[in-house]
């Protein structure tokens, strides 16, 4: 199970992200259920982890505009297992998207310092 807290009306969790060169950094990510990819990170974190560039990706933002993202490869410690993921570069705070949470249940106590839990769903 992954846990976090609600701060300033944002549900957040801490994730350990690793680059192919072995560099590791813990990031605080805001959970965004409207974001369909796995994770976005700011350029400074991507550079610090020395993440390898993979490709470009287009996305529709919440305001309806289209944006082109650089996409990088990373590993993330997710509920005790290492997952290979694609990371969007975005000049904003890190976002945790729905793709990484697939197969998990998200619960949020929507109040200041409320508990956030992401728990693996039982297999069918």
What are the residue ranges of the model-derived segments?
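Pepsin/retropepsin-fold aspartyl endopeptidases
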Residues: 1-124
């Amino acid at each position: 199970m992954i846990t976090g807290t609600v701060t300033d009306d944002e549900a957040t969790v801490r994730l350990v992200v690793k680059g192919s060169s072995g560099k590791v950094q813990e990031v605080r990510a805001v959970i965004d259920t409207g974001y369909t990819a796995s994770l976005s990170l700011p350029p400074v974190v991507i550079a610090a982890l020395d993440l390898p560039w993979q490709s470009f990706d287009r996305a529709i933002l919440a305001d309806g505009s289209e944006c082109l993202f650089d996409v990088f490869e990373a590993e993330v410690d997710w509920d005790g297992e290492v997952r290979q993921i694609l990371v969007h570069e975005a000049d904003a705070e890190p976002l945790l998207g729905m793709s990484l949470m697939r197969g998990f249940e998200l619960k949020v106590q929507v109040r200041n310092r409320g508990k956030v839990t992401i728990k693996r769903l039982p297999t069918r």
